[in-house]
UniProtKB/Swiss-Prot annotation:
Official protein name in the record: Spore membrane assembly protein 2
Region feature Disordered, mapped onto this chain: 348-369
Family named by the database record: Belongs to the SMA2 family.
Residues that span the membrane, as ranges: 7-27, 221-241, 266-286, 320-340
Length: 369
């Protein structure tokens, strides 16, 4: 009768460990355009604009991308670009158009337009940094415009992301050092603030935007490695549960395997908690880039912008919901793992207790003295 009970306990632990690991599969989607384009994103974002600074920035970027698209077509490597229709707006870089939706995941992202996926690609080890996703999309589209060789589009995206990271670091250092010189160079490049206009100066707004982009870049790199580590520990948890079941089939009481079971389950929950918290923090950070809706259009009270860079519409994806379900299963697995480990751990033998008691009791010689 004891063996079937042990088998049932091990079966429940194994089902839970396999279930939580299977729920990691959505986290690895959004990386491949070939075949069936599966994507269960953590977040979906759309560039829509909001504050005056963000609208000016988006308009400038759109015009710049239009110019770059024209230059890329004119300097293209293919003779196929002879039709004047290639200069129409729908054939140019459309990253910052409001009808384009980007589905972000840990290892890649998908671009969607009118509910149909345009493409999916891996995002290397940069995680879900929304700005790097936009930059990579620009590079991929430039690659599609400039050459017919499909393997070049990935290189365009990689090189443009690397350029963005280097430029962001340089601009951040430039604006920080320029503060000590009275923002002389910044005023020459951006312009002096209008004394009649209330609010932060353009220099401060751009520095705030650059600092926010830099923080997002570093933060998402950390979240990416948390996600990788969590998947590895989740797989090791299956191995430990399987070994624990093999040990239970041999005997009821064990010393090592209960300790391994409790340790692996605890480490998994700790890392999963860090990942969930990071995702929640990132969601809150993205929400600060979302313009507030003005309920009364005719009201004199305008929406209060928290950063001056409100330009995104952010939604939670199906992958985020599955991550919460996986996290709940991991907590159930942790509780059952501790109960099973404490129940089937080896108890001290009577001989061990006798040895301990005799070692702690005083000797007869000492009693006589």
């Amino acid at each position: 009768m004891l063996f079937p009970k042990r088998l049932i306990v091990w079966g429940v632990l194994l089902i839970l460990s396999l279930s939580q690991f299977v729920l990691y599969l959505p986290a690895t989607t959004c990386t491949n355009s070939k075949g069936l384009r599966l994507c269960a994103p953590q977040f979906t974002i759309t560039v829509i604009g909001g504050s005056s600074t963000a609208n000016e920035f988006i308009a400038s970027v759109r015009e710049f991308l239009r110019l770059i698209s024209y230059l890329t077509i004119d300097m293209g490597w293919s003779n196929e670009f002879t039709d004047p229709s290639v200069y129409e707006d729908e054939n140019l870089v459309d990253t910052f158009q409001p009808d384009k939706v980007f589905e972000l995941n840990y290892f890649g992202f998908c671009k969607r337009s009118n509910k149909s996926k345009v493409y999916c690609t891996s995002n290397e080890n940069y995680g879900m940094d929304v700005l790097e996703v936009l930059v990579r999309d620009v590079g991929i589209q430039l690659g599609n415009i400039s050459t017919t060789r499909s393997n070049e589009t990935k290189k365009f995206g990689d090189s443009l992301v690397l350029t963005y990271r280097l430029a962001l670091t340089s601009i951040r250092d430039f604006l920080k050092h320029d503060k000590h010189t009275g923002n002389a160079l910044s005023k020459a490049l951006i312009g002096s603030p209008d004394p009649n206009v209330k609010g932060a100066s353009p220099t401060k707004n751009y520095l705030k935007g650059v600092n926010l982009a830099f923080i997002l870049m570093m933060f998402n790199g950390m979240v990416f490695y948390f996600a990788v580590l969590e998947i590895i520990v989740g797989f090791l948890s299956i191995c430990v549960v399987s070994a624990f079941g093999g040990a239970l089939s041999v005997g009821k009481r064990h010393r090592l395997f209960p300790i391994l079971l409790k340790s692996s389950s605890s480490i998994l929950v700790v890392i999963a908690t860090l990942t969930i918290l990071c995702n929640i923090v990132y969601l809150i950070a993205l929400k600060t880039l979302e313009p507030e809706e003005v309920t009364d259009v005719g009201s004199d009270n305008a929406a209060v912008h928290t950063t001056g860079w409100e330009l995104l519409k952010v939604n939670v994806g199906s992958g985020f919901i599955m991550g919460l379900a996986r996290y709940a299963i991991q907590w159930v697995l942790l509780v059952l793992a501790f109960l099973a480990a404490n129940h089937y751990k080896a108890k001290p033998k009577k001989s061990d207790k006798y040895t301990e008691d005799t070692s702690n009791s005083p000797s007869p010689d000492l009693m006589e003295k």
